Regions:
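Short beta->alpha connector loops at strand-helix junctions that form conserved
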Residues: 3-8, 83, 198-199
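Active-site phosphate-binding strand-loop segment of PLP-dependent enzymes
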Residues: 7-63
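Short acidic/glycine-enriched loop/turn segments that link adjacent beta-strands
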Residues: 12, 93, 168, 202-205
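PLP-dependent enzyme catalytic core of the Aspartate aminotransferase-like
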Residues: 41, 187-191, 196, 200-231
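PLP-dependent aminotransferase class I/II
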Residues: 78-158, 162-165
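Short beta-strand-to-loop capping motifs
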Residues: 101, 174-178, 211-213
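Conserved PLP-binding catalytic core of the aspartate aminotransferase-like
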Residues: 147, 159-191, 207
């Protein structure tokens, strides 16, 4: 059994929700689809309240401006940090990821893995993964460009009246008080621009916009401006 914990009114994780007895904790940081980031200090406090539980932090989007909790691995044996090669390294097709934690904790993960999935990572994925690590400086520069484009896009959308969460990811989560999110989504689709619309409580007036290159984001911003001005 598991229990999901609601975010607060600002779509942030409430650290106090994780101070009670539990069988384990897992959450993404930065979060999805909001992009909100919890501080290392707050995560440290959560772990300190849970000495008998494994705390798993999914840092899939951490390289787009966030501060990693990896230094806390020296402090806590019950912390597990997971990274993917799908986002920052743009290798979704390789199905590569890493789990970092205490040696004993990792050995237990191997026991579980081998009980239902004994398939190793294929040779091609290993070569690709190793090459991407060796090319980390180039990939970091690419991530910096994404962050710069993200901030420029946020600024332009704010000038059009949009509000948004404080995203530390390669996407932004936006809302407009005067325009229905589903309407904007459908109008953008007519222009062959796809964003993510969530028909779900609390977030059905938000759109998640993935950050592309400057040319793609300029086309997106121009399209949004046309939709707003025509309404």
């Amino acid at each position: 059994d598991y229990k999901t914990m609601p975010l607060d009114d600002a779509f942030k994780i409430k650290k106090e929700d994780y101070f009670t007895k539990n069988g384990g904790i897992i959450f993404p940081n930065p979060n999805a689809p909001t992009g909100e980031l919890m501080s290392v200090e707050d995560i440290d406090e959560i772990i300190s309240h849970n000495p008998d539980s494994v705390v798993v932090i999914d840092e899939a989007y951490i390289d787009f401006g966030g501060k990693t909790v990896l230094p806390l691995l020296k402090k806590y044996d019950n912390l597990l940090v997971i990274h993917t090669f799908s986002k920052f390294r743009s290798l979704a097709g390789s199905r590569l990821g890493v789990a970092l934690g205490n040696e004993e904790l990792i050995s237990h993960l191997y026991d579980v893995k081998n009980s239902f999935n004994s398939y190793p990572i294929d040779a091609l994925a290993q070569v690709i993964g190793e090459a991407s690590i060796q090319d980390s400086d180039v990939i970091k520069e690419h991530a910096k460009k994404i962050v710069a484009t993200r901030e420029r896009t946020k600024k332009s959308l704010k000038e059009m009246g949009f509000t948004m969460t404080d995203s530390y990811s390669n996407f932004i989560f936006v809302h407009h008080d005067d325009f229905d999110a589903e309407y904007i989504f459908k109008e953008l689709r007519k222009k062959h621009i796809i964003v993510r619309y969530f028909n779900a409580p609390r977030i059905n007036q938000y759109l998640r916009v993935t950050i592309g290159n400057d040319e793609e984001m300029d086309a997106f911003l121009d399209a949004v401006k046309e939709i707003i001005q025509a309404s």
